[in-house]
Amino acid sequence: MAATFLVIGLGRFGTNLALRLMDSGNEVMVLDSDEELVNHIAPHVTQAKIGDCMDEEVLRSLDPASFDFCFVCISENFQSSMETTSLLKELGAPMVVAKADRDLHAKLLLKIGADEVVFPERDMAQRTAMRFSVNGALEYVELAPGYAIMELDVPDHWARHTILDLDIRKKWNVNVIGRKEEGAIRPIDASFVFAADTHILVAGRPDDITRMVNKG
């Protein structure tokens, strides 16, 4: 069953988020005060509304309690983001996710009711930095502060060796959790022999993964 989303704010993040959610088969309503932005995205989402997100009656008319997730994507105007987040919770929104640019803003948003805060620019910068600073890195996902999963090509000297031979966990404090083959994630055990073109998924602290690949 498709999830329902309310996306408030049609900047770059809000627009791209709404479109990707639609691509994934969800139902998406968007709200912004800029008529041009709303008209541009309207053909591509379930519903598109023009209105002031800080107007309680406007938000009430959208029935925030009926959405599975409400995204507040207006971090450029922090006062507006705060008020909108607070109003959504007052109107019964079950899950409010707010965009923030600073840690202080995130703390305040959580304090007034946001269920989760995201930092899209910072997260993208971190992913990009990791991809280009780690040899062979293909993808990077931070699961929690200080813990990540990375997809990468195996280092050249791993070829023809097993996880057991290389003693990866003990030496680097990194776990090899799977391998990617023909687009699918497959299990891997300690006796698997790496080939030069093996793609693996590893989990651990980002600095440990970096040391393992670049120095190991």
Language model regions located:
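Residues in the short beta-alpha loop(s) of Rossmann-like NAD(P)-binding domains
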Residues: 11, 34, 102, 206
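Phosphate-bearing ligand-interacting subdomains
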Residues: 40-128, 153, 208
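Anionic-ligand binding region
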Residues: 103-166, 191
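Hydrophobic Val/Ile/Leu positions in short beta-strands of Rossmann-like dinucleotide-binding domains
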Residues: 6-7, 72
